[in-house]
Amino acid sequence: MFVSRFQSSETDGLYAWARLWAALGIMTIGGFGMYSCTVALLPVATDFGLSRGEASLPYTLFTIGFGAGGIFYGWATSRWNTARVLLIASLIYGSGFLIASRAEAFWIYAVAFGLPIGFLGAAATFSPLVADISLWFERRRGFAIGIVISGNYIAGSIWPPITQALIDALGWRDALMFIGLFCLSSMPVLTLMLRRAPPILDDEGPGVQFVAPKRPLGFHRETLQGLLCIAGVACCVAMSMPQVHIVALCSDLGLGAVHGANMLALMMAAGVASRLISGWISDKIGGFRTLLLGSVLQLIALTLFLPFDGLYPLYVVSFIFGLSQGGIVPSYALIVRENFPARDAGWRIGTVMSFTLFGMALGGLMSGMIHDVTGTYEAAFLNGIGWNLLNGSIAVFLLWRAKRLLIKPTKKAI
């Protein structure tokens, strides 16, 4: 009985859940790239004789590669077997760490993080996995997406201290080599769980309960896609202000960088809970309403940063912020699955997710520039609130269109 249930490729089945946990593991390991890059910044800068700004180049290249690679791999997994694509990507990803660990010139180190680790490696472990899991669940699709996309928050909670401990014990070169060998030995094994093709790849045929409209919400498909991309940029420009600058904010306030790092870890931990809770809620109310709910909650949390500058109030606000914003990004994947053909899920979800990453990069840069001009983070928070209002306006507009056209947002798309 158990074996037959596991062998079944039905949606929401036993195999679908096993596939989900394997995908979560892959996404979590895929987070090593971002956090090893940031933790190794100071020792790398010392070894190569670089300024902080110069030593930040690998992170910048990684972020660009991670975002652009999400679009590429979204397209690739829409056309080829997910496991095959991820197997190749995981081998490139692990090898990238080995290249970086032996780099004799800084440009080789930087390119290693941008190309094999970022664009060709880690990018395959984010949006393509979200798209893949969305094809395997119907009744609990939102909850499943919330679980798998928690991987990057889990990575943010566990990899920085582990990477720091490895660097302290081995030095940054051997630490990166150890990470590379770990990735090469673990990720290919997990990809074996993803070998089966999705149960339904088309929107036609027996058992299909919902056919994606040719004009979702009355728009051309690319119009809705564009609105989701703009919303993704807007929400993450706002989201990036606390996530990228909370440590610097605490230093400016005289609270110490250690407390800032603890607040960031608290945000990440609360973000995991938020993604699970929001996923469960989205199965009840649909993607559009979940997006609007998350946007409103994030707006409230961002506003709470303005009147408080004490240690304990900022811990509380950081926790509230983490709980508020975790459901926004997963809602885009759910909206895509509710309104577009299943066969397009890979590249459409990959594109929207990549725009959220571009929003994080843009927001972090904008907030830093605003701080440099004004000398405080108050204007940067106001800037984030403005972008959040843009995101909320798009969410309200899309939900209004759905109601106006008597199209009930559904989670039945297959």
What residues fall within each predicted segment?
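Hydrophobic core of transmembrane alpha-helices in multi-pass small-molecule transporters
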Residues: 28, 96, 108-123, 233, ...
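Extracytoplasmic gate region of multi-pass secondary transporters
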Residues: 37-41, 223-278
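Interfacial helix-cap and linker-helix signal at transmembrane-aqueous boundaries
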Residues: 44-45, 76-77, 158-170, 250-251, ...
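Helix-to-loop junctions at the C-terminal end of transmembrane segments
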Residues: 69-82, 275-286, 371-372
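C-terminal ends and interior cores of transmembrane alpha-helices
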Residues: 91-104, 297-309
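Cytoplasmic helix-loop-helix junction between adjacent transmembrane helices
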Residues: 113-150
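Helix-loop-helix hairpin linking two adjacent transmembrane segments in secondary transporters
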Residues: 148, 152-198
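C-terminal transmembrane helical hairpin of 12-TM major facilitator-type secondary transporters
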Residues: 265-271, 277, 282-335
